[in-house]
C-alpha cells in the first residue's frame, strides 16, 4: 500500500504557481483527500509540510484559488480575517 504523501502528490498539477488539486473537490471547490478520514487537501498538505495550523486559525488561499495546495499560497488567519479577505477584490 502506498504512503498517503505519495498518493497525494500524484493528484497535484505542479505546472503553475498554484499547485492545482486534480482529484475530488467539495462543492465550493476545495480539494478533498482521504488519509484515514476525508480531509481538505490544502489543509492536509500544509500539516505534512509546514506543521499544525495554529489553534483558532484557518488557512486562507492568498491566491484566491480554492483548489490550490501550494503552502506558499496559504496563510493562517482568523475566521473573521478569512471572511473579510473573501469579500475583498483580488
Language-model regions: role of each:
Residues 1-90:
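Conserved recognition-core residues within compact binding domains
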Amino acid at each position: 500500500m502506498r504512503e498517503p504523501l505519495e498518493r497525494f502528490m500524484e493528484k497535484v498539477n505542479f505546472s503553475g504557481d498554484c499547485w492545482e488539486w486534480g482529484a475530488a473537490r467539495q462543492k465550493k471547490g476545495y480539494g478533498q483527500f482521504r488519509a484515514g478520514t476525508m480531509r481538505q487537501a490544502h489543509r492536509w498538505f500544509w500539516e505534512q509540510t509546514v506543521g499544525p495550523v495554529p489553534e483558532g486559525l484557518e488557512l486562507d488561499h492568498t491566491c484566491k484559488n480554492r483548489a490550490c495546495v501550494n503552502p506558499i499560497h496559504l496563510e493562517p488567519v482568523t475566521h473573521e480575517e478569512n471572511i473579510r479577505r473573501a469579500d475583498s477584490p483580488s
